[in-house]
Amino acid sequence: MAPGEPFSQRRIGLTGGIASGKSSVGRWLAQQGLPVLDADQFAREALAPGHPATNSVMQRYGSTVRAEATEAIDRAALGRIVFHDPAERRWLEHLIHPIVRERFDQALSLHADTPAVVLMIPLLFEAGLESLCSEIWLVDCDESQQLERLIARDGLSPKAAQARIAAQWPLNQKRGLADHVVANQGHPGAWQPQARELLKMSPTAEL
């Protein structure tokens, strides 16, 4: 939890490495009735056709990232650029992160009277968004599992998958920054009892 005034609202920051299982935990939290604000969704919307950020990306990369016969961005082509060039990744993050932060502020205002909300943010620590959260849950798995899951999920080569993992802070660095670590090393859904106990906790317990 970031230092400062205590929140009147429980704000669960849900993060973890790529392919660690954040989305599964996020879907489960939504099934428990919590609004889930999704940074990835906000980022996708920011790069929709006609948006200012989309125009900036098109101006920088041109037809290389333009989906055939449309004004949309070919996200796979953009990924091949930014996950293999740290300077280009930083440029894109500097473009998108302020937009995502603004969308979170807007969404949190809409949910101001909701007792608890979830902020699902893959790059929570990298983007410095800890101050939005009253507590942070890290969905954790072994690095080897992370690689295997990413290759299977996205059909990537091992090299391409490693590049995407390397673009984020390592899980062992994030473990020490989270308030709670949700273990996702076992079979699918093995994390649910732990998540259920965390959800039942007082928002201020152990923080």
From Swiss-Prot:
* Gene3D superfamilies associated with the record: P-loop containing nucleotide triphosphate hydrolases
**Which top-level group of life is the source organism from?**
Bacteria
* Keyword Protein transport on entry: no
Matches recorded under InterPro entries: Depp_CoAkinase, P-loop_NTPase
- Annotated ranges, domain DPCK: 11-207
Q: What is catalyzed by this enzyme? A: 3'-dephospho-CoA + ATP = ADP + CoA + H(+)
Stored CDD domains: DPCK (cd02022)
Q: A GO CC term?
A: cytoplasm
Pathway(s) it belongs to: Cofactor biosynthesis; coenzyme A biosynthesis; CoA from (R)-pantothenate: step 5/5
Give the location in the cell. Cytoplasm
Protein's GO biological process: coenzyme A biosynthetic process
Question: What does the record give as the function of this protein?
Answer: Catalyzes the phosphorylation of the 3'-hydroxyl group of dephosphocoenzyme A to form coenzyme A.
Entry's family note: Belongs to the CoaE family.
Task: Identify this protein by name.
Answer: Dephospho-CoA kinase
- What organism, scientifically named, is this protein from? Synechococcus sp. (strain CC9605)
Q: Which gene encodes it?
A: coaE
